[in-house]
């Protein structure tokens, strides 16, 4: 995996955001989706774990959270934060595409703010479809880098269909 200056700068920004308290409330965002104890969650493009840690607490010890990112430093930060907060149900995956997870093994996939950064969107969306359980859902959070209309345009070419929107969160199920 090659060094990416843009990703490194984003990592630094996220760390600073969390340390100086720029208004950002991942727990409130997570409450907008239906996550239950015991579920298996994939936080694809987890960054420093802003959503990973709260989700891991929600699914509890019977659940599991896979935190996937292409930046080793981001994953190291997730591991350190999890240890500090006593969260032991997070498994990190270093990858920029393939998850390595079994078919139909994930209840909920979080794709929060990272869709614009994914180079091969077709490959990644096929991979996410592969690992998602038949009754699971893909939750995409849109932001200033990619508007809702563009996400819907991309998703129209996939095997996912929009089932729900809550603020900036779009939830998709398998067709």
Explain the meaning of each model-derived region.
Residues 122-137:
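A short glycine-rich, Lys/Arg-flanked "PGG" loop and its adjoining helix->strand segment in the class I
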Residues 38-47:
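Conserved class I S-adenosyl-L-methionine
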Residues 86-97:
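Conserved SAM-binding strand-loop segment of SAM-dependent methyltransferases
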Residues 98-109:
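A short acidic, Gly/Pro-enriched loop at the edge of an enzyme's catalytic core
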């Amino acid at each position: 995996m090659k060094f990416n200056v843009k990703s490194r700068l984003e990592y630094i920004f996220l760390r600073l955001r969390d340390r100086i308290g720029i208004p950002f409330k991942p727990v409130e965002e997570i409450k907008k989706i239906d996550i239950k104890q015991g579920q298996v969650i994939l936080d694809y493009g987890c960054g420093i774990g802003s959503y990973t840690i709260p989700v891991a607490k929600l699914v509890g010890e019977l659940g599991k959270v896979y935190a996937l990112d292409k930046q080793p430093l981001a994953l190291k930060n997730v591991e350190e934060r999890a240890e500090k907060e006593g969260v032991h149900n997070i498994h990190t995956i270093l990858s920029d595409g393939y998850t390595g997870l079994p078919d139909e093994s994930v209840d909920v996939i979080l794709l929060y703010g990272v869709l614009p950064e994914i180079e091969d969107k077709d490959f990644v969306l096929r991979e996410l479809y592969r690992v998602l359980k038949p009754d699971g859902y893909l939750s995409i959070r849109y932001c200033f880098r990619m508007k809702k209309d563009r996400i819907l345009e991309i998703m129209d070419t996939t095997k996912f269909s929009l089932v729900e929107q809550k603020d900036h969160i779009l939830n998709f199920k398998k067709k």
